[in-house]
């Protein structure tokens, strides 16, 4: 994806009081929902400029370039803003797994009549993923 001028995009986004907006990552060709994370203005601008998805890590208090540690990068295919301007949908090409648990998606726990059920298997050990 070519670099996108971020000024108009940033003007359209309604960041919360902490300067953040939720971002949903979806596999561009299958529609699989991979994860939800937060973005700030700087991470939005970097994502649009580089085509590599960058989030804001609330726990680390800084930019989180997806895949920087694990190698499991997300390449931006499309950047969509919802009707209220307060949520972003990132259509991405995900390298490997998206979840820090080693699963393809972070949405692997299903609420079923019999209780909570894990519906996705670990594909890569987290220890291997992060070389702990």
Swiss-Prot record:
Co-factor(s): Mg(2+); Zn(2+)
UniProt-annotated binding residues for Mg(2+): 82, 84, 86
GO CC term, one of those recorded: cytoplasm
Biochemical pathway: Amino-acid biosynthesis; L-histidine biosynthesis; L-histidine from 5-phospho-alpha-D-ribose 1-diphosphate: step 3/9
Main location as per UniProt: cytoplasm
Catalytic activity: 1-(5-phospho-beta-D-ribosyl)-5'-AMP + H2O = 1-(5-phospho-beta-D-ribosyl)-5-[(5-phospho-beta-D-ribosylamino)methylideneamino]imidazole-4-carboxamide
UniProt KW keywords: Amino-acid biosynthesis, Cytoplasm, Histidine biosynthesis, Hydrolase, Magnesium, Metal-binding, Zinc
GO annotation terms (biological process): L-histidine biosynthetic process
EC number: 3.5.4.19
Coiled coil: none
Origin: domain of life: Bacteria
MF term (GO), any: zinc ion binding
Cofactor stoichiometry and binding remark: Binds 1 Mg(2+) ion per subunit. Binds 1 zinc ion per subunit.
SUPFAM superfamilies from the UniProt entry: HisI-like (SSF141734)
Localization in the cell: Cytoplasm
Chain residues that bind Zn(2+): 83, 99, 106
Described function: Catalyzes the hydrolysis of the adenine ring of phosphoribosyl-AMP.
Subunit structure, as described in the record: Homodimer.
Entry similarity comment: Belongs to the PRA-CH family.
Xref: HAMAP family: HisI
Stated name of the protein: Phosphoribosyl-AMP cyclohydrolase
The species this protein was found in: Paramagnetospirillum magneticum (strain ATCC 700264 / AMB-1)
Lineage: Bacteria, Pseudomonadati, Pseudomonadota, Alphaproteobacteria, Rhodospirillales
The gene coding this protein: hisI
């Amino acid at each position: 994806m070519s670099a996108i001028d971020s000024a108009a995009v940033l003007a359209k986004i309604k960041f919360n009081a902490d300067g953040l907006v939720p971002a949903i990552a979806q596999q561009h060709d299958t529609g699989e929902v991979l994860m939800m994370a937060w973005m700030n203005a700087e991470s939005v601008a970097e994502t649009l400029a580089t085509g590599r998805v960058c989030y804001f890590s609330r726990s680390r208090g800084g930019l989180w370039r997806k895949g920087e540690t694990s190698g499991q990068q997300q390449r931006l295919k499309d950047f969509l803003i919802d009707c209220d301007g307060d949520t972003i949908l990132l259509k991405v090409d995900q390298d490997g797994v998206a979840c820090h648990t080693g699963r393809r998606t972070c949405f692997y726990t299903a609420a079923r009549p019999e209780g909570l059920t894990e519906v996705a298997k670990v594909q890569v050990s987290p220890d291997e993923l992060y070389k702990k």
